[in-house]
Amino acid sequence: MSKTLLVMAGGTGGHVFPGLAVADRLKAQGWTIHWLGTADRMEAELVPAHGYPISFIDIQGVRGNGIKRLLVAPYRIVKSVLQARRVLKTIRPDVVLGMGGFASGPGGVAAWLSGIPLLLHEQNAAAGLTNKLLARLAKRVLMAFPGAFAPSRRTAVVGNPVRPEVVALPDPQLRSGAEPLRLLIVGGSLGARVLNEQVPPAVAAAGVPIEVRHQCGKGNRDAVAEAYAKQGVAAEVSEFIKDMAGAYAWADLVVCRAGALTVSEVAAAGVAAIFVPLPHAVDDHQTRNALTLVDGGAAEFLPQSELTTASLAARLSWLAGRRETLLNMAQAARRVAITDAAERVADECKRLATGQIEREL
C-alpha cells in the first residue's frame, strides 16, 4: 500500500531544497507527497513548480520581533496548530517530516497531537529553537552536522540532502585548473551586501589574474557589475545561478556565507572555500556550520568584522599562487561530505512508517 509523507519546510532554500530532495526520492518509490508551508514565502511557488500539492497555515516567527508580536504569539500559534490539524485530518499522512521553517512548529505539534509519527531534520550545526522544542515530541531527530543535539538512540547524523548533480561532480583533482584563479562568489538568494561591496575592490587589489563569477542576489546586478567595471575587473555577475553544479565545477575557490545548504554543497562539490558567516544569524549557527569544514582543513574562516578589501585581497593573492593548497582543501571537503543524505532521510521515513523505529526504541 502506498504511503503518504507530509513535508514541513519553507522560508528559505536551505529548508525547501533538502525537503524536495527527500520528496523526489520517496515519490520515485511510490509515496504520495504533500507539503505544509506559508503562503507568503518561497515554498508557495517553488513546491507546486516541482509538482507537489501544498497547504498553507498562518504563522510568523516570534524571536526578536518586539513585545506586541510576542503578546499575540500564543493566539497565533494555537490558531496555526488547529489549521495544521485540519490539514492532517484531510491528508492522513503516515509520517510528518519537519525540515525547518515557520510551518514546522505548529505542524509538528499538530502531528504529535494527532498521533502521527514526527521525524525532524536539523540542517544547521546549532539547533534552532523550534527543533529544540519539537525534539521532545519527535520519534526521531536527524542532524546534518554532529553536535546539534546530544547523541542518543533517537538521534542520528545523516548530512544535508543536496542536489544530485552536485554530488555527481567529478573528483576535484580532475577539475583543478591552471591560472588564472577561478573565483565564485555566492551571496544567497537575497545576496550578501558585504560581499557585493568588498569583493570587487579586493579582486582588483589582489594583484593576480582572477576570473570571477558573482551571484549577487535579486536587484543587485547593475550595482555590482558597475563596481567591477570601475575596478577594471571583468566579471560575470548574475542575480541567481540556475546551474550551481556547473558553477562549483568551474570554481577553484568559493567565497560565500555559511548557510547549512551552502556548506553542505561546498563539501559535496569538493571545492575550496572562504566562509564569511552572517554575523547576526540566530544562535550564530553560520559560524558553527562553517567550522565543520574549517576544522577539517577544507575551508578558511573570515569573520565579517575582519573582512576588508585588504584582508580579502591578501587571502586571494596567497591562495592564487598555491594550487596544491586549493586542491588539498577541495579534497578535504569531499572527505567530510555526506553525499547520500537524501537517501538516509528517506530511509528513516520508511522505517518510521513501517513501525521499525518503534520496535528498535
UniProtKB/Swiss-Prot annotation:
Its EC number is 2.4.1.227. One of its GO terms (biological process) is regulation of cell shape. It is found in: Cell inner membrane. GO terms for cellular component: plasma membrane. Pfam families: Glyco_tran_28_C (PF04101), Glyco_transf_28 (PF03033). Pathway: Cell wall biogenesis; peptidoglycan biosynthesis. It catalyses: di-trans,octa-cis-undecaprenyl diphospho-N-acetyl-alpha-D-muramoyl-L-alanyl-D-glutamyl-meso-2,6-diaminopimeloyl-D-alanyl-D-alanine + UDP-N-acetyl-alpha-D-glucosamine = di-trans,octa-cis-undecaprenyl diphospho-[N-acetyl-alpha-D-glucosaminyl-(1->4)]-N-acetyl-alpha-D-muramoyl-L-alanyl-D-glutamyl-meso-2,6-diaminopimeloyl-D-alanyl-D-alanine + UDP + H(+). InterPro entries: GlcNAc_MurG (IPR006009), Glyco_trans_28_C (IPR007235), GlycoTrans_28_N (IPR004276). It comes from the Bacteria. HAMAP family: MurG (MF_00033). This is UDP-N-acetylglucosamine--N-acetylmuramyl-(pentapeptide) pyrophosphoryl-undecaprenol N-acetylglucosamine transferase. It comes from Aeromonas hydrophila subsp. hydrophila (strain ATCC 7966 / DSM 30187 / BCRC 13018 / CCUG 14551 / JCM 1027 / KCTC 2358 / NCIMB 9240 / NCTC 8049). The lineage of its organism: Bacteria, Pseudomonadati, Pseudomonadota, Gammaproteobacteria, Aeromonadales. The gene is murG.
